[in-house]
Amino acid sequence: MATDSALINLTHHFLIAMPGLEDEAFAKSVVYMCEHSDRGALGLVINKPSDINLKNLFDKVELPLRRDDLTEAPVFQGGPVQTERGFVLHESMMPGSESVYASTMTIPGGLEMTTSKDVLEALSTGAGPRKVFVSLGYSAWGEGQLESEISDNSWLTVPADVAVIFDTPVEQRYDKALMLLGLQSWMLSPDAGHA
């Protein structure tokens, strides 16, 4: 199946859900795209906190958490795939070199996504990356699926600004992502782009 995905690469972009998006799991979502290729796409929803915080998560995996700045930080619902598995999006510890963690995907823009427990162990001792985003689950699209959803006006796309992920309160992330496009939520219509 030929797609236009060779023409666009949405890695290190935000997907911003349009009001007409039919999948309720993604209503008003902002998804940070960790990987996008002709084989599919993988991202993390950055504005849907779960009901547990990092202290709860660290207790569950039997690790102490010695960083007071993280104890009340929420664990997010990264998406509907593998919701029992943890994903840690963080700043690169050593930009331009191989990751210090066992199972890590390097993402353009100075970020990494790690799925191995060693990043949690580093955080538990006060070491590890300074800025982290932790989710359970991820979002995924098969070959051509995301491109089809974009052409159906389900998503807006914009290059990511890491400040939206790490420095913006959760309840403001959707609006901040829209502002990167010069838009506000009241400007969006569920019927936009449809004849």
From Swiss-Prot:
One Pfam family here: DUF179
Domain of life (superkingdom): Bacteria
PANTHER family, per the entry: UNCHARACTERIZED PROTEIN YQGE, UPF0301 PROTEIN YQGE
Name assigned to this protein: UPF0301 protein Bpro_1142
GO cellular component, as recorded: cytosol
InterPro entries: AlgH-like
The family this protein is said to belong to: Belongs to the UPF0301 (AlgH) family.
